[in-house]
Amino acid sequence: MKRCLTAASVILFFSFWMLRLSLAQEDADPRKWTVDDVLKQEFTGSYDISPCGKWVVWVKTRPDKEEDRMIADLYLSALGDSTEIQLTRGKADDRNPKWSPDGKYIAFISSRGEDKEAKDQIWLIHSRGGEPWVLTSLKNGVNSFEWRTPDKIVFSAREDPYFYEQELKKKKDDAIVVGDQEHFLPVRLFEVSVKAKEVERLSMNQGRIGEFAVSPDGQWVVTNEDQNIHYPYDNRIPPRQFLYNLNEKTREEIFTEKRMKPYDYVWTLDAKGFFCSQSVSSDPDNDYVSVATLYYFDVTTKTYERVPLNWNWELGYGYQMTQEGLLTSLANGPWNKLAFYQKINGQWERHWLEDADSKNIHVHTVGKDGRTAIISYTTASVPPRIKVAKMQDRHLQEQRDIIKINPWMNEKYIAKSEIIQWKGAKGDPVDGVLYYPHNYEAGKRYPLMVSIHGGPAGVDSDVFRESWGSYPNVLASRNSFVLKVNYHGSGNYGLKWVESIKGHYYEYEVPDILKGSDYLIKKGLVDPDRLGITGWSNGAILSIQCVIESDRFKVVAPGAGDVNWTSDYGNCAFGAGFDNAYFGGPPWERPDYYIKKSPLFKMEKVSTPTIIFFGTNDTNVPTEQGWEHYRALQQIGKVPVRFILFPGEPHGLRKLSHQRRKMEEELAWFDTYLFQTYEKPNEAFNEDSPLGLALKKGKVKKTDGWYGEESNGVLVPEVVELDSLWIGRFEVTRVQYAAYKKNLQFKTGTENYPQNEIDFEEAKAYCQWLSQVTGKKYRLPYEKEMRKLIQKAKGNVAGENNLDYWAGYAITPDEATMLLPKIEQLENGLLLSVGSFKPVGKEPVYDLGGNVAEWCVDENGQGVILGHSALTPSDSKTLYQPPHLKYVGFRVLLEKE
């Protein structure tokens, strides 16, 4: 029996995709976005303003390489002068901070401590700082909490393990009973005293309390209580809502009408009622596909009413209670629309927020005074600016930046963006967010990557977002357009739009996407022969269908996308709810329809190289969907296919290492089949090895064996870009300096040594001469620039020409003094040829951590010596002392026009 290899299986035999796949293609320009940039972003959130209105506590989420995940810390910022204080640190996630009503404490949720199996508990920290302490110690942990009084906190939690659970644990019985409604164990309300640490049970409900909200006066609690273990799957038996009177210890069911299942409760400032969201659908029996509208509940009359929004697209991104009414975000496509709603003399009134930038403003929280707000301003081309503002006369007044995040983005290219519109599948307008190539030139055509959002009821907004799932600036750095499409079925466009694909799945979305690329081709922006498409979740689902219906795409990268709706029905965590809504019933009632809608049965039409991503623990889009997709393409053997699994990951990737691998694999695929710039890395080659360093050094400019380049017949220093500075690759060498100082004498063989024993005025004079000779503007680095460069080389100091190198060990200050007599016996001292040690930067810069210390200019124009020299120990605990001039030199900086 003969065995043959298909094209797809041959591709799989090659290992040229492993690790560092895209790194070979990263341009040396530090302003371009890289995978590292995406992963080093920090994020802010969970803002809570102090009762006095002078402070805000918030959460910064930061990447931790050692933990391989994002970690959340608490911060405190003054609203007056933006003073920033870090309250917590470590390896635990500290989240959901809330001020006590008297402003004395901040409570938060955390599993901090040495026990890796620790559950989430309520922790407290004094508002003036200090060490946090744990308030609760429940065996099953705490779900969420709210302050009731300065001494009382209401929280939701499970009871301690029941005897049934304890017995299973003793037996090491970890079998799972699927759909075990009998053991759908309740989540209840409890109250804990700050002073006494005593816990009191407030409810005996049998359902699971998910969301709850405590009234400002501490008398009332409104709850959502899940009733059925199958509800997330089939959307049948919904949660029930209850109103607790904590003073009278009563509980009353509210919102008892059919289909009423409100959520997102916000109390009025006077505690007389609350607002909430409610799903609205045209289907009287199934509201799985819906939009949200606004209701108001009066606690005195126990009645509720729908608030007339007078806005066809209904609610958008939530709401906040203010002195001027409920500040509400209304659905507005890719933007925001902010309005106040208030009942005056029995009539609801709407007034718009008056701000020229309101469509790009998001209100995160409003203080207890109903006026102080934390807001952010962002567009697809403007990273979020976090501000404090005062609400007065329906304006956001006294806006001021208070929290600065990711300042390094100021030194990065940010792609130009715009909201564009074209005619979609039904002849109606479709919106998209278009990102331009970083080096865009009018009249030229560029590649296009279509990046599709999930949902389907998600939305791509005019906000800045760069993530492992979608990274438009990384692609713009590869000189590509990126288009995000708000296809039929997307959210934030009203009920008609979101419901339009019920019974028409794929039929409108795919044409919307294809017509978007047609529009850009027709405008002369995009090269029709260089199109790619990618997406995660529903974005992957639509990407897969697009390459079935069209052969225009040169590459497709679906992550966590369905191909077989029949198997999805039983394996997806919400399979019945989703599939019944969009496909009109279960597969046993509509088998032919399910097959018709499943891309799996059309895989022979695919002609696009495909890379597939999945987490092994994904239940939103079950992992076996990836296997079915991969096996079909692999067995058909028509196109290259690659399948990447991420162990332990759910629907979204959590580990930083997995996020990195996903992006690097994806970019390598794009570089190969779309951009055609991919170069296979040598898996045996270590860039930091002596061989790697020698190869790097071999690319530097030389003239007659001397470092530098010729300009107007004169040998001058070579400059390269490092962190947006055009800096000398080496310290100015003796032979370079000799071109300026004609009578300079030095020993043969030391031409490439750094010029030493130079004072400040001599270094400045050389820069002036160099400027005259070349017609370019050279100078010494400013002190702040030099410190930035030294910081860049901090991790390199141990391997540079400093005293530790000559001693052969990490030398102490005492030992350095003892070693001086030995050093004086060396005829040429400790200096070596520039570039003798490991550099920093992709376009390498040498000797920032040794050889000679270097002159720079302080803010007063005076000379300052900074940096390590061959005579300097690397000991960071010693106060820096400049070395003798024998070990002082300089390097030049070129000012680019």
Where are these regions (language model features)?
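Active-site-proximal cap/loop segments of hydrolase catalytic domains
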Residues: 471-474, 484-693
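Hydrophobic beta-strand positions that form the internal "hydrophobic ladder"
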Residues: 56, 103-106, 153, 221, ...
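Cap/lid segment of the alpha/beta-hydrolase catalytic domain
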Residues: 405-523, 527-529, 536
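Residue-level detector of Asp-centered blade-edge/turn motifs that repeat once per structural unit
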Residues: 51-52, 101-102, 148-149, 216-217, ...
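A short glycine-rich, aromatic-capped structural motif
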Residues: 702-747, 751-762, 768, 850
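A flexible loop/linker signature enriched in serine peptidases of the S9 family
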Residues: 43, 60-73, 88-95, 107-123, ...
